[in-house]
Amino acid sequence: MSIQQNKRPVVIGVTGGSGSGKTTVSNKIYDQLHGQAIQIINQDTYYNDQSDMTMDERKAVNYDHPLAFDTDFLIKQLTDLRSNKAIEMPVYDYTQYTRSDKTVHVEPTDVIILEGILILDDERLRDLMDIKVYVDTDDDIRIIRRIQRDMVERGRSLDSIITQYLATVKPMYHQFVEPTKRYADIIVPEGGENQVAIDLLSTKIRDILVKRGHTELR
């Protein structure tokens, strides 16, 4: 579905701690709005370019701190998408702990879901969102999910995951991530298992789309 100039994209911010179920919530919203042009952008894509650092230096970075992200670049590109301009989105290489040389061409869509642990930390970024969602999940469940994900999808050892969790992930969650809950419009307990919250969010997004001229949804 093409997007007209007067139909500004709806931006949904989905945040919460690592392993909280952000991706599941985002994917379920995506599935419910399958009739619309919709895309998910992950904040991890905007980790800083660290190509000038050694591998040891890259591994020592605190990736759960706001300064680990190139937030200015994310704001610029999200602003472009909201203005119906295409972008060349960076690609992050988890195996090399830095940004890849590749980019992905991204066109503006009716709905943009921005997902990440610290997307509500910066006021400038919050101001670009129409709906801000915080996925609230118990710490024990989150660490179990993180272990499963990082071992299977990112090839990491159990020891390295636990070390990072205790050193940075857990303390940064309580220092930076959890406090952003106060900025959320909607708090979703139980993550992707909360179908009522998913349905309410999808209905609200459709309502915003109609108000912006998507009369085909009436």
From Swiss-Prot:
Q: What EC numbers are recorded for this enzyme?
A: 2.7.1.48
Keyword Thylakoid found:
no
Q: Which GO terms describe its biological process?
A: CTP salvage; UMP salvage
User: Kind of enzyme, top EC level?
Assistant: transferase
Q: What is its main location?
A: cytoplasm
Catalytic activity from the UniProt record: uridine + ATP = UMP + ADP + H(+); cytidine + ATP = CMP + ADP + H(+)
Concerning InterPro entries, the annotation shows: P-loop_NTPase (IPR027417), PRK/URK (IPR006083), Uridine_kinase (IPR026008), Uridine_kinase-like (IPR000764)
Q: What compartments host this protein? A: Cytoplasm
Record pathway? Pyrimidine metabolism; CTP biosynthesis via salvage pathway; CTP from cytidine: step 1/3; Pyrimidine metabolism; UMP biosynthesis via salvage pathway; UMP from uridine: step 1/1
Question: What keywords appear on the UniProt entry?
Answer: ATP-binding, Cytoplasm, Kinase, Nucleotide-binding, Transferase
State any single GO MF term: ATP binding
Classify the source by domain of life.
Bacteria
Q: Which SUPFAM superfamilies match?
A: P-loop containing nucleoside triphosphate hydrolases
Q: Which residues bind ATP?
A: 16-23
User: Mind telling me which GO cellular component terms the entry cites?
Assistant: cytoplasm
Record-stated family: Belongs to the uridine kinase family.
Protein name (database record): Uridine kinase
User: What is the name of the gene encoding this protein?
Assistant: udk
